[in-house]
């Protein structure tokens, strides 16, 4: 009987405990729901930010079907064509720094030391592009007569596995005396070899040059504006171009810019200049060449030369708005204010040349800028590498902090 009396007295205690547990569970469910909602919002922000970071010019992105985990797994095992895990990346093996390795070399090009030497990296088969360049911005008459400084232009090529093409290069060299050909197979993954061969050849044949420019055969170079830029701001150490910051290696083996982890394991590349066109003083060229001889090869030429080698040589790459790695508006006043224009085929080389030199077009005193090119450049600081805008990262960080605070309530 005493026990029966005690039961009702214990019931309120049990009831209160149940209500407390119910409230606790309700609070936990609410926090969990809020957490899921915030994670969903983060996901919606993250996905467009990720995709907007891909190249607006080249459009090569990883397949949506591949998860980041699978890309990281593949990156540790997938071999880069021509540069497998066991392939030596010691440049001295290929460059032979103590020997002359060039098959073809222009004679007398630096008998009078140039103020500016432009080396155009060209593919063996791209004769039409070289002809267009010789007829426009590298026109020999203009180079010899119109500028207050000595400017020389030469084309750098590797070898083809097609003997017919190699024979045509010999004929072209005999006709124009402006071709440097080195002993390596001219492929995309050998572009670093090509640029280091450029440094070697210049150091051996044109070491009294004041400035060296490296560019490609799909580029229009505004030589008068480049000369004006170099002369107005002379520096003993110059490494100038379109600066790319905080770029991340691509881990998708199907991508053109795939970087296997056995070649580069860091999360980001050092700041570097777009390989479409950059200029250096000869002192810097010498430092970069010496750094390359002791830096393991990386097949991405611009990352290697102006990033890794520049970092080792303690040379800082500097951005200049006149350089760009995208196409520009075909506006004469825009083109006149651009040092380099990218993605120019042979026919457009003539079109741009005519527009730039059309005396009937008068540009006002204000510098006209290609806003579209700048917008593209800012939204994807490097064509082909994963980059996030600083503003987007700050937003994601802020939302993450708020999320953690709410969940902890």
Predicted regions and their residues:
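Secretory-pathway lumenal glyco-enzymes, predominantly type II signal-anchor Golgi glycosyltransferases
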Residues: 2-409
């Amino acid at each position: 009987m005493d026990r029966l009396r005690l039961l009702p007295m214990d019931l309120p205690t049990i009831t209160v405990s149940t209500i407390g547990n119910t409230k606790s569970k309700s609070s936990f469910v609410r926090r969990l729901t809020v957490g899921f909602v915030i994670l969903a919002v983060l996901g919606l922000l993250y996905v467009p930010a990720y995709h907007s970071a891909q190249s607006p010019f080249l459009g090569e992105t990883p397949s949506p079907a591949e998860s980041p985990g699978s890309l990281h797994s593949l990156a540790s095992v997938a071999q880069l064509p021509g540069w497998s895990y066991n392939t030596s990346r010691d440049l001295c093996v290929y460059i032979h720094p103590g020997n002359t390795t060039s098959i073809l070399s222009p004679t007398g090009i630096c008998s009078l030391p140039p103020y500016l030497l432009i080396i155009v990296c060209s593919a063996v088969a791209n004769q039409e592009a070289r002809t267009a360049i010789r007829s426009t911005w590298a026109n020999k008459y203009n180079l010899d007569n119109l500028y207050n400084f000595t400017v020389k232009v030469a084309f750098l090529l590797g070898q083809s596995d097609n003997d017919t093409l190699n024979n045509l290069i010999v004929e072209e060299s005999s006709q124009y005396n402006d071709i440097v050909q080195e002993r390596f197979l001219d492929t995309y993954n050998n572009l670093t070899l090509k640029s280091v061969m450029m440094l070697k050849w210049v150091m051996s044949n044109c070491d009294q040059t004041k400035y060296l420019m490296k560019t490609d055969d799909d580029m229009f170079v505004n030589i008068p504006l480049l000369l004006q830029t170099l002369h107005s701001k002379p520096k003993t150490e110059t490494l100038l171009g379109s600066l790319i910051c905080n770029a991340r290696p691509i881990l998708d083996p199907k991508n053109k810019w795939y970087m296997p982890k056995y070649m580069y394991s860091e999360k980001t590349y050092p700041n570097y200049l777009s390989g479409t066109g950059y200029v250096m003083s000869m002192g810097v060229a010498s430092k970069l060449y010496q750094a390359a001889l002791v830096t393991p090869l990386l097949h991405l030429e611009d990352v290697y030369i102006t990033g890794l080698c520049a970092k080792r040589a303690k040379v800082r790459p500097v951005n200049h708005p006149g350089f760009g790695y995208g196409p520009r508006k075909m506006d004469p006043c825009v083109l006149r204010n651009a040092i380099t224009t990218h993605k120019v085929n042979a026919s457009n080389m003539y079109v741009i040349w005519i527009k730039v030199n059309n005396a009937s077009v008068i540009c006002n005193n204000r510098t006209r800028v290609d806003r579209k090119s700048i917008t593209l450049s800012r939204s994807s600081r490097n064509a082909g590498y994963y980059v996030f805008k600083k503003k987007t990262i700050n937003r994601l960080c802020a939302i993450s902090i708020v999320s953690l605070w709410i969940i902890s309530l």
